[in-house]
Amino acid sequence: MTTDNDTAAMNGATALIETLAECGVELCIANPGTSEMHLVQALDRVPKMRSVLALFEGVCTGAADGYARMTGKPAATLLHLGPGLANGIANLHNARRANSPMINIVGNHPNYHVGFDAPLTSNIDTLARNYSSWIKSESTESTLAQDGADAYTATLRQTPGSQGQIATLIMGADAAWGESQGPVAPNALPQRSKITSDVIDAIASKIEAGGKVALLLEHHGVSPEALANASKISAKTGCRLFTGTFPARVDGGPGNPEVERLPYFPEQVLQTLTGLDHLVLVGGEPPASFFAYRGIPGQLVPEGCTVSRLTQNEEDAVDALSRLADRLGAAAETVKTFERRVTPRPTGPLDTKSIIQAVAA
């Protein structure tokens, strides 16, 4: 952090980067332009945050998404006005769906310059609204640091449905170069809400009633701790465990809890779930076809299968599954894990199957 003597002359950009670094943001992936030059200088001044130049904005947003999935922490992106933001939107869509925490810092013209309709002027708010759970577009040099702290907090606040955890801070160049009061302290960290005992009892009763039951685990429900608790429930009750077709992240391989993944095509999903009497949602929604197909239902729940919910996406799935395991008497059960399989070297003609087998061996 800077000294008292330094903060008096600190500009908004440096106050913002100092604040984000104190919050715990360690990486900024940048494709800056003229409006973001003060941010680039600030990144050089704050060694606690590493900056990486990317030559295309989609790389910035895609890398930040991957970083968040692997670390659970937000990275920052630095993008140049509306066109730069637009170039990164495809991967921002993926990040929103994956509930990846991310902070987008988007440079903009000062308010007094927007009216001149310069070549890169656009409605950045409209672009950002498609995938952001938090937007701030009127920052000044005196609010920019606190806005950064609020953006960080927003990325850790789980939101209902598919709103995601992306914060977009649209920063006028004058807020970056203007004199600030220095960095601010991080906000208190948000916590996931916990479900009630009534929900635990209701789900336990459905599982204990008999019939074929499956847990569909998504988002927070596929963390290693959540999967371990789900595996104990499966060992005790015989219920099946599924993740969605494309989970944001799931730890597989030998030693990790065993879980099935739903296939891609709708006919295969329906076939996989055929015979189920009850499907329990742990985060996420009932499985749906990626596209509409003639003669195939959009929601892929077999006829006669009822659906209930243990947790919403924003609720604490680890705690819920742990308490459900206790309620079912499964806390002492052994977690079933993937085992290492020895893959023999292939023989015969070279084809797709033998190539994959050779790589695996």
Predicted features and spans:
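N-terminal alpha/beta PP-like core and its mobile active-site loop of ThDP/TPP-dependent enzymes
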Residues: 2-344, 348, 358-361
